[in-house]
Regions:
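Short, conserved non-catalytic motifs in the polymerase core
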Residues: 25-33, 58-85, 99-111, 173-196
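N-terminal juxtadomain amphipathic helix
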Residues: 36-54, 59-62
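Conserved polymerase palm-domain catalytic core
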Residues: 49, 118-219, 223-242, 258, ...
Length: 380
């Protein structure tokens, strides 16, 4: 049994397929390109090392990311990524996600932000049919979810579900990449699986013990509906107790109870019920402001020759596709005008620059002509 399940991870076929999944967006790196160009040979070599116990991961590289917020990120060697991807995709992910409730929406096949937004709309419409605009929402956010995640809690989450031989491989990777007793980097696929798994027991508690129908979680952001403030306060107390036992805490400013009719901010949109039961989505104004600043900066880079117009167009198109998920027709029209005006400003600047240069040349020409005429008169 152990050998069969290990073969699903470290067999040549598994590693070779994993290599093809890992190549996306990284073949510009010399190390990744070299591994991929000699894929069969490298996969066989990696298989041999893993089966003989001579495999040793290379030290991860740490770097800083500044957007959307400043944090430390970790990059691992391509060969190590191939092995870990095989382990995650072939065994860890399918086992860990088996017990998930449907409303656990992050980092899973067939789910994601779009599905999460749609589920919230369904909950709101269902609530309106039963209660109209009356009722409240408890919205929760865990303070520093990944930076404060206990290594003991994460490892225990994996240990409870994974076969011993797979858990041993998982534990070794976690301990080699992350020092100390607390804190993970969310860039790793294994850590993302930990992120959606650690709170799985809480999801079941909320649904089955607290009898909450309208409950949804996207990683460490979650919300639920209730008829009264008191009802939701009781649920909040139970959730806080559960989280504190696992060394987490709710963010005091981002966790609150408020009327449903105020609208629910979730994943970059505000979902608001109208008096007729229709749900409208309004994109976060901060997102619009950031996009305008980003576009202006990128147009400036095009002007300096550091970026292509095509790249800027693609970025703006992607943002419009995101905005279109809400009720944003008028906003998109305004942004189209703003974007067009940015290029007009650039063209006007170039025109003014050319006009100024031309005027200077004319002035210099007149000066030279007057000087020549004066010299001729003097000669006479």
């Amino acid at each position: 049994m152990d050998e069969d399940i290990k073969e699903q991870v470290i067999g040549f076929e598994a590693l070779y397929k994993s290599m093809h999944r890992c190549k996306k967006n990284v073949l510009w790196k010399d190390s990744a390109a070299s591994f991929y160009l000699n894929g069969i040979e490298q996969a066989l070599k990696l298989e041999k090392q893993l089966k003989e116990g001579t495999y040793k991961p290379r030290p991860p590289k740490k770097f800083e990311i500044t957007h959307p917020k400043r944090r430390e990120a970790v990059s691992i060697a391509f060969r190590d990524r191939v092995y870990q991807r095989s382990l995650n995709d072939n065994v860890i992910y399918p086992i860990m996600t088996q017990s998930f409730i449907h409303a656990n929406m992050a980092c899973q096949k067939g789910k994601g932000t779009d599905a999460a937004e749609n589920l919230l709309d369904e909950f709101l419409k269902h609530w309106y049919r039963l209660h109209g605009l009356e009722g409240y929402v408890l919205q929760c956010d865990i303070r520093g979810y990944y930076p404060n995640m206990s290594h003991k809690v994460a490892e225990e989450t994996f240990r409870k579900k994974l076969p011993p031989v797979i858990y041993e491989m998982t534990e070794k990777i976690l301990r080699e990449q992350y020092e100390g007793e607390k804190g993970y980097n969310p860039g790793s696929q294994m850590i993302q699986i930990a992120g959606i798994s650690v709170l799985d027991p809480m999801d079941h508690m909320v649904k089955e013990q607290l009898h909450t129908k309208e409950f949804e979680r996207y990683m460490d952001d979650f919300q639920m509906f209730g008829e009264t403030v008191e009802e939701l306060q009781c649920r909040r107390n139970a959730i806080e107790t559960y989280l504190n036992e696992r060394e987490f805490e709710l963010h005091p400013k981002k966790t609150r109870i408020y009327p449903i009719k105020e609208g629910i901010k979730f994943l970059g949109f505000t979902h608001r019920l109208t008096s007729t039961g229709k749900v409208i989505r309004i994109i976060d104004p901060k997102n619009v402001k950031q996009e305008r600043k980003k576009l202006r900066r990128m147009v400036g880079l095009v002007k300096k020759g550091q970026m292509t117009r095509k790249k800027v167009d693609e970025c703006f198109k992607a943002w419009k596709a995101h905005a279109a998920k809400g009720n944003s027709t008028k906003l998109i029209n305004r942004m189209n005008k703003y974007y067009a005006d940015l290029w007009k400003e650039d063209q006007k600047h170039e025109h003014d620059h050319d006009q100024k240069k031309e005027n200077c040349e004319r002035t210099e020409g007149k000066g030279r002509h007057a000087g020549t005429a004066g010299e001729a008169a003097g000669d006479t």
